[in-house]
Design a protein with these regions (language model features):
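A short beta-strand submotif of the Rossmann-like class I SAM-dependent methyltransferase core
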Residues: 48, 75, 121-124
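Structured binding elements
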Residues: 91
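Phosphate-binding glycine-rich loop
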Residues: 23, 28-72, 86-88, 96-98, ...
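Conserved coil-to-alpha-helix start sites within the AMP-binding
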Residues: 78-84
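N-terminal "arm"/small-domain region of PLP-dependent enzymes with the aminotransferase-like
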Residues: 1-23, 28
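Active-site phosphate-binding strand-loop segment of PLP-dependent enzymes
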Residues: 102-183
Length: 183
């Protein structure tokens, strides 16, 4: 679908970096980008990893550390496979909750009906540039002591109550894969 979004100038900058650098991970450019990204989002910290899938896995590893090694994670039935694979691969059970047609996100009512004593977190995927949050979802997560994890890979720049998505939950994931759009 996208075959011409990497310009010749982009390729030249990348080639220059590869030819003149001896450090390809966790170098000064990564730190510079983490700082710029944090400033743009309006948050204190950002941690860059190699992919949105890895970011999903990191959020589940953190969930396991904070909430224990077993339990349920509320997830939507649509999104990217890594949202579900990260849940399963860290020992949790995904609980699928249907999305609404307004913003293609799981709704407060469906989340509320799915919460059990074993629920540890909610993975809210913001799809296709939409914001999937509501104050009711934020309040429910706090009331039930659930982690709210925002997958923002498809909705960079979307807002809720004048704040960028990805800043209202406990953790968030973004992806800069070339096929994702920046809203």
């Amino acid at each position: 679908l996208i075959n011409d979004n990497i310009s010749q100038k982009d390729k030249e900058v990348l080639a220059d970096f590869i030819l003149n650098s001896n450090r390809f991970t966790n170098g000064p450019k990564v730190k510079e980008f983490e700082s710029a990204w944090s400033n743009w989002l309006g948050v204190k910290y950002s941690v860059m990893v190699n992919s949105g899938a890895s970011a999903n896995y990191v959020t589940m590893a953190v969930t396991r550390e904070l909430k224990g090694h077993h339990g349920e994670i509320i997830v939507p039935p649509i999104g990217w496979v890594s949202d579900i694979a990260s849940v399963i691969n860290t020992g949790f059970t995904p609980v699928f909750v249907d999305v609404n047609m307004k913003n293609i996100a799981i709704s407060y009512e469906n989340i509320k009906n799915a919460v059990t004593k074993d629920t540890k977190a909610i993975v809210l995927v913001h799809c296709l540039g939409f914001n999937g949050l509501s104050q009711k979802i934020i309040d429910l997560a706090k009331e039930k002591d659930l982690l709210l994890i925002e997958d923002c890979c498809e909705s960079h720049g979307a807002t809720f109550d004048s704040k960028k998505i990805g800043t209202l939950g406990n953790m968030s994931c973004f992806s800069f894969y070339f096929g994702h759009h920046i809203t």
